A protein has these predicted regions:
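Conserved phosphoryl-transfer catalytic core
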Residues: 22-104
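Asp-based, Mg2+/Mn2+-dependent phosphohydrolase catalytic module
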Residues: 1-3, 179-259
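Asp-based phosphoryl-transfer active-site loop
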Residues: 3-22
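Substrate-recognition element of Asp-dependent hydrolases with the DxDx(T/V) motif
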Residues: 118-122, 130-172
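Short His-Asn-centered micro-motif
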Residues: 10, 157-160, 187, 215-217
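Phosphate/adenylate-binding glycine loop and adjacent helical scaffold
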Residues: 110, 114-120
């Protein structure tokens, strides 16, 4: 008798959902509503926490011009506040302009910024709750989640924030799928291109790496997962980028192919 995986670890883009959902729906929505969201929620603790993380990330920025631009804007606004006694709202407006410019710069380059992903997640939350967004999933996803969850754990690992992941499956085109999902992981766990990230996930789900099946549409993510000891499957969905014929991973076109 063949024993199946104890954990089904899944990517989102190109695996559970079409790649186009993120690039053509979610990203444009976050970009369109970024400024309004920041201005409406600037003083909230979550936004300030993201801003603090953004500043820390910026200090490690490899593009020196962006480091200087963002850091100088932030420093100047604080100095102006202290020297002239300008009210908090005026200072916030100055800082928001700097933050928006840097966030748009990150978006344009598809940077995997944890602070950006967190902000995007909350913007999307507003969209889902307003009925303006729907988490599109492939037709085979719901059945597979229900089937797998009866004998194993279903977990998600995406570069999008955990909050954003939960929204996709809570407001999915197949209904609320969150009851079938045991755990969510994002870049706070580590880069998807690092074997250490998959070992960390194995510890958190309390399963040996060899009992975890990771499914993704990207070979550069599957390789480190396999190096960590995980089983792998390459998701080949409509709209995905072409993959090399000799990639070393078993290919699937539907979750129905996996027991």
């Amino acid at each position: 008798m063949t024993i199946g995986p104890r954990v089904y670890l899944l990517d989102i883009e190109g695996t559970t959902s079409p790649v186009s959902v993120v690039s053509e729906q979610l990203f444009p929505y976050a970009r369109k509503h970024l400024e309004a969201y920041l201005r409406d929620h600037w003083s909230e603790a979550e936004t300030q926490a993201d801003l603090s993380l953004l500043i820390e990330e910026n200090r490690l920025e490899s593009d020196e011009k962006q480091i200087l631009r963002f850091a100088q804007d932030h420093k100047i606004s604080a100095q102006d506040d202290k020297a002239s006694g300008i009210g908090e709202q005026s200072i916030a407006e100055t800082e928001i302009d700097s933050v928006i410019a840097y966030l748009l710069w990150l978006m344009d380059r598809d940077r995997k910024s944890t602070a950006l992903k967190s902000l995007q997640g909350r913007i999307w939350k507003s969209g889902y709750e307003a009925g303006e967004l729907v988490g599109t999933v492939f037709p085979d996803v719901a059945e597979a989640f229900e089937r797998w969850s009866k004998t194993a754990k279903v977990a998600i690992y995406s570069s999008g924030s955990v909050e954003a992941q939960k929204l996709i499956f809570r407001y999915s085109s197949a209904g609320d799928l969150t009851p079938f999902i045991s755990a969510y992981f994002d870049t706070r766990t580590g880069a998807k291109t690092s074997p250490a990230s998959y070992r960390a996930i194995a510890e958190q789900v309390q399963a040996a790496p060899k009992s975890i099946l990771f499914i993704s549409d990207l070979v550069r993510e599957l390789d480190p997962a396999r190096e960590a000891g995980c089983m792998t499957r390459l998701s080949v969905r409509e709209g995905n980028q072409p993959v090399p014929d000799e990639n070393g991973h078993t290919q699937i076109q539907s979750f129905a192919e996996i027991d």
